């Protein structure tokens, strides 16, 4: 039936050609060629049907995979943001997840149309290894960025000491972290340097301890000095009273008695409490005629007779 229809189409084309064009065509050759094509289609219709189904399935897999990857990526981004993860890192991780899903979807679609997926995976693996060797330093920073996001030893708006630099954390990117120093400089630190070194976080705890070294002259009354220093501490409202307050003689220095004073205050009050207490210590010691020694140079003049 299909063969008869093809022959009818061939003859119709010949009639149209004779009527509307001046090009002469060999009727027998045209019909034979079309008949051969029709015969091939009849013999391979099952194969063509199978390829059509596989190609359609591959397209459906790609479309569905793209749709699912977008949904999962957006959902992951929202979850990361709700857990107070930096928006830049959340966006990068969600995008990375989307590309991974798309890659596996593409491999599955290729397998559906008969492509050997093992070869594709091998090629992707070799390409990934080459890229990894070329970007070894960047990948180490990327891995360090993932650790910073996961372990969270520091967060934005926290004041940290990274050994070579100290400052407030502005952003934690996937490859680097930016800090603002106390004098307003912006410092970019590779994440690998942060993970491989010591991290001192000054903002994580709500309270911090101030420490003072107060030096007085050797002729001072030790008990009176301790009493004065402790009185100043106890009168300061910003000092946390339920934490240990330590006042004591810590050293007999070459030219002074050194007293150590330790007290706790809220993190955001640390510097102002330190400055105010230092001024109050000096005023109270002066009121009680207790001298604070300072370096002196004795010059002896000898006169020759």
UniProtKB/Swiss-Prot annotation:
<dbReference type="InterPro" id="IPR008910">
    <property type="entry name" value="MSC_TM_helix"/>
</dbReference>
<dbReference type="InterPro" id="IPR023408">
    <property type="entry name" value="MscS_beta-dom_sf"/>
</dbReference>
<dbReference type="InterPro" id="IPR006685">
    <property type="entry name" value="MscS_channel_2nd"/>
</dbReference>
<dbReference type="Pfam" id="PF05552">
    <property type="entry name" value="MS_channel_1st_1"/>
</dbReference>
<dbReference type="Pfam" id="PF00924">
    <property type="entry name" value="MS_channel_2nd"/>
</dbReference>
<dbReference type="Pfam" id="PF21088">
    <property type="entry name" value="MS_channel_1st"/>
</dbReference>
<dbReference type="GO" id="GO:0005886">
    <property type="term" value="C:plasma membrane"/>
</dbReference>
<dbReference type="Pfam" id="PF21082">
    <property type="entry name" value="MS_channel_3rd"/>
</dbReference>
<comment type="similarity">
    <text>Belongs to the MscS (TC 1.A.23) family.</text>
</comment>
<dbReference type="InterPro" id="IPR010920">
    <property type="entry name" value="LSM_dom_sf"/>
</dbReference>
<feature type="transmembrane region" description="Helical">
    <location>
        <begin position="89"/>
        <end position="109"/>
    </location>
</feature>
<keyword id="KW-0472">Membrane</keyword>
<protein>
    <recommendedName>
        <fullName>Uncharacterized MscS family protein BU452</fullName>
    </recommendedName>
</protein>
<dbReference type="InterPro" id="IPR011066">
    <property type="entry name" value="MscS_channel_C_sf"/>
</dbReference>
<dbReference type="InterPro" id="IPR045275">
    <property type="entry name" value="MscS_archaea/bacteria_type"/>
</dbReference>
<dbReference type="InterPro" id="IPR006686">
    <property type="entry name" value="MscS_channel_CS"/>
</dbReference>
<feature type="transmembrane region" description="Helical">
    <location>
        <begin position="120"/>
        <end position="140"/>
    </location>
</feature>
<dbReference type="InterPro" id="IPR049142">
    <property type="entry name" value="MS_channel_1st"/>
</dbReference>
<feature type="transmembrane region" description="Helical">
    <location>
        <begin position="52"/>
        <end position="72"/>
    </location>
</feature>
<dbReference type="InterPro" id="IPR049278">
    <property type="entry name" value="MS_channel_C"/>
</dbReference>
<keyword id="KW-0812">Transmembrane</keyword>
<dbReference type="InterPro" id="IPR011014">
    <property type="entry name" value="MscS_channel_TM-2"/>
</dbReference>
<keyword id="KW-1003">Cell membrane</keyword>
<keyword id="KW-1133">Transmembrane helix</keyword>
<dbReference type="GO" id="GO:0008381">
    <property type="term" value="F:mechanosensitive monoatomic ion channel activity"/>
</dbReference>
């Amino acid at each position: 039936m299909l063969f008869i229809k093809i022959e009818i189409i061939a003859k119709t084309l010949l009639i149209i050609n004779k009527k509307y064009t001046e090009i002469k065509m060999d009727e027998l050759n045209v019909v034979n060629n079309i008949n051969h094509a029709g015969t091939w289609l009849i013999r391979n219709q099952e194969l063509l049907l199978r390829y059509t189904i596989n190609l359609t399935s591959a397209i459906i897999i790609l479309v569905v995979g793209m749709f699912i990857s977008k949904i999962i990526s957006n959902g992951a981004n929202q979850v990361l943001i709700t857990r107070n993860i930096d928006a830049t890192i959340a966006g990068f991780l969600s995008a990375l997840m989307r590309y991974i899903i798309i890659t596996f979807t593409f491999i599955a679609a290729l397998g559906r149309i008969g492509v050997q997926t093992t070869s594709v995976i091998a090629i992707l693996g070799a390409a990934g290894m080459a890229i990894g060797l070329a970007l070894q330093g960047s990948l180490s920073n990327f891995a360090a960025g993932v650790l910073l996001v996961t372990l969270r030893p520091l967060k934005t708006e926290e004041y940290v000491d990274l050994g070579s630099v100290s400052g407030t954390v502005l952003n934690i990117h996937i490859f680097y972290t930016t800090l603002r120093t106390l004098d307003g400089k912006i410092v970019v630190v590779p994440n690998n340097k942060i993970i491989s070194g010591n991290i001192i976080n000054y903002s994580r705890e709500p309270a911090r301890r101030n420490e003072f070294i107060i030096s007085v002259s050797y002729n001072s009354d030790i008990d009176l000095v301790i009493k004065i220093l402790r009185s100043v501490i106890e009168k300061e409202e910003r000092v946390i009273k339920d934490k240990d307050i330590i006042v004591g003689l810590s050293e007999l220095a070459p030219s002074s008695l050194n007293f150590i004073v330790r007290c706790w205050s809220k993190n955001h009050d640390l510097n102002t409490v330190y400055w105010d207490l230092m001024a109050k210590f000096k005023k109270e010691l002066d009121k009680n005629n207790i001298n604070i020694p300072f370096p002196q140079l004795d010059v002896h003049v000898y006169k020759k007779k």
